[in-house]
Amino acid sequence: MAKNDYVEIMEKNHMEIPWHDYTGNDSEVLIQQAGLIEKASVVGRVGLIMLSCGTGAWRVRTSMNRLSKELGVTCTVDVGLMSIEFNCFDGKECVSQSLSIANTGVNTSKLYRMEQFVDSFPSREAHLTGEEIHKRLDEIEQIHALYSPVKLGLAAALACCGFTFLLGGGPVEMIFAFIAAGVGNLIRMKLIKHHYTLFLNIAVSISAACLTYAVCLHMAELLFHISAVHEAGYICSMLFIIPGFPFITSGIDLAKLDLRSGLERLTYSIIIVLVATMFAWIMALLLKLQPQDFAALHLGNMTHLFLRLIASFCGVFGFSIMFNSSVYMAATAACIGAVANTLRLELVDFTRMPSAAAAFIGALTAGLLASIIKRNHGYPRISLTVPSIVIMVPGLYLYRAIYNFGIMSLTEAVSWFAAAIMIIVSLPLGLIFARILTDRTFRYCT
């Protein structure tokens, strides 16, 4: 093998698919009259773009099925986290393809545009040639990040600042978490932009967030005589790393018995959590930080309720922007999250309801509200529900579980871990039952 060929392979482990080679550039044959290979290329590419947006297997398969029916072919699909295997039949021939993406992520703006493409396909794209359809898909595929790394750093800062208050932190912890999370996610986005590997960007961004928080705390002690009791907020500064989308979509996939996709997404989420919490624990040992309880805020009930609404709105808005939502879509998700998360917290405080049960009700509420809004605005349901309940994911519990495992305080570790697992299971369950109640296509086993 020539040296240049070797370098080219090393530069891109996943080779790009020449989609336009499946069609004749000068062909005027409409896609409905085209051959099976050309039809399969359109169906497969639509599924692959949907998969790259972070949506679950059920939505990917549904989109591919809708296009297949319109093109007069039968399609069977097996979907994973990073790849799709599918077969297309037209009664005479069969085409089998295995497609994969180079990396996984979340892009709700691209997902929204793809859902519009699928919805309009019978009336618009079905009357075009394969080449024209691929050109339109080229345009959609170019929808990358809507925001610069600096803006995404600010979004993470806002989200973690709101998260800090909701977990019991005060103004000092909120300010430090804002700065540290902003720095951490800014570095993370820079690393992602340059295609650094997953483990490296998690380790560096988490370490940077912890270090920034510790520096801010130390400077505040020296300059303003701030008490070291505020060190507890360092946990909140790294909650931007929570893999909310794969966590929730894994539960939805498992509910539809898409076991391959569900287990792969769950594994991916666990990898992120383990790497993040391990490096956070190491940084805590090096910087002598401890996950203490927050100091009491002594707020009145109505004041606390009002501030929880604001903090929940800010937290969900920040996470939604991080998922590449438009500002209006992010604000819509934030309104849902403000209602659902505040309801969850109030149920825990005033009815002594177990946290897991309250999380189920909060997620159910978010799912019902998202279904109502989807009917009126057409936003992808998952683009509203996942950001609105990411703020309910018990990142603090998961970190404390790993921290206590690290110091061999096993009883404490198991207690925190059990509480986290109960809440994590309850969140997708709430969304699933909301979907069952409001979506007849999801309700039945087909």
Task: Label each PLM-derived region with a short phrase.
Residues V150-L154, M174-I179, L200-V204, L266, ...:
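Hydrophobic alpha-helical transmembrane segments
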Residues L166-A180, V229-P243, A295-A311, T351-L364, ...:
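Structural signature of hydrophobic alpha-helical transmembrane segments
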